[in-house]
């Protein structure tokens, strides 16, 4: 009788536990992306335990968005062990074939984090994979340009660096547009071309890149890039660069 009762109780506990896991899994998968974004912002801004715990639990029950948000919060942590955990979580996501995680991991490994050294070889691996999914990703293209231009973890390749820099500029990344303008302006890795230099410099300035507006200001003051000297344009772009810097400092 006791054995039979024990069996019944064991079955009941198993059913209850299974029901709990099922309900928890369903609940986790139904958490809105807005809620996940809110936990992510709170966790990154305040490093509070509660939003991090929420992301951990939701991620543990199979919510893919929560898993990626958790990785982002962890790599921005003030604690080295959590930053390492975040990089490893991004690596797992990248291995699972998530293009955004591959792009982010490649960027992190290119720049490094406090206490975590860059790994240029692995960075190039993930960035190349990410680019194969989306060749229009401006940041991925720019990061690859940086690797090839500087010869990080490989032999320097100026032609590949320019190819990726052009992709990043065409995809709308202001810093890439500014650097491409300088390539045309100074004839470093591209033929000297003032018209193209001015075109890309203007696009970067219109995107509120401070150094682009300052460079454009000096071009007007000195009559460079085919521009006539113009003091009013010079001061207009100086003021615009100051505005851009204030905007950047508030971000």
What is each stretch, according to the model?
Residues 199-202, 206, 214, 218-221, ...:
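TPR/TPR-like (Sel1-like) alpha-helical repeat modules
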Residues 56-58, 90-93, 129-130, 167-168, ...:
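Canonical positions in the second alpha-helix
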Residues 18-76:
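N-terminal leader/linker segments that initiate helical-solenoid repeat arrays
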């Amino acid at each position: 009788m006791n054995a039979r009762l024990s069996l019944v109780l064991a079955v009941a506990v198993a059913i209850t536990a299974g029901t709990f896991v099922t309900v928890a899994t369903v609940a986790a998968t139904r958490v809105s992306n807005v809620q996940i974004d809110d936990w992510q912002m709170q966790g990154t801004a305040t490093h509070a335990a509660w939003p991090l715990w929420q992301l951990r639990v939701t991620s543990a029950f199979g919510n893919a968005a929560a898993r990626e948000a958790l990785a982002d919060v962890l790599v921005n942590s003030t604690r080295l062990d959590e930053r390492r955990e975040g990089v490893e979580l991004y690596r797992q996501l990248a291995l699972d074939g998530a293009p955004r995680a591959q792009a982010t991991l490649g960027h992190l490994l290119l720049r490094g984090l406090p206490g975590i050294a860059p790994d240029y070889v692995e960075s190039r691996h993930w960035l190349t994979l990410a680019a194969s999914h989306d060749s229009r990703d401006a940041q991925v293209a720019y990061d690859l340009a940086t690797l090839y231009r500087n010869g990080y973890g490989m032999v320097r390749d100026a032609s590949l660096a320019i190819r990726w820099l052009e992709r990043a500029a065409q995809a709308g990344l202001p810093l890439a547009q500014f650097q491409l303008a300088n390539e045309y302006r100074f004839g470093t890795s591209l033929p000297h071309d003032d018209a193209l230099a001015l075109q890309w410099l203007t696009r970067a300035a219109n995107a509120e890149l401070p150094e682009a507006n300052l460079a454009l200001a000096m071009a007007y003051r000195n009559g460079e890039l085919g521009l006539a000297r113009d003091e009013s344009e010079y001061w207009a772009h100086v003021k615009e660069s100051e505005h851009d810097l204030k905007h950047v400092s508030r971000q």
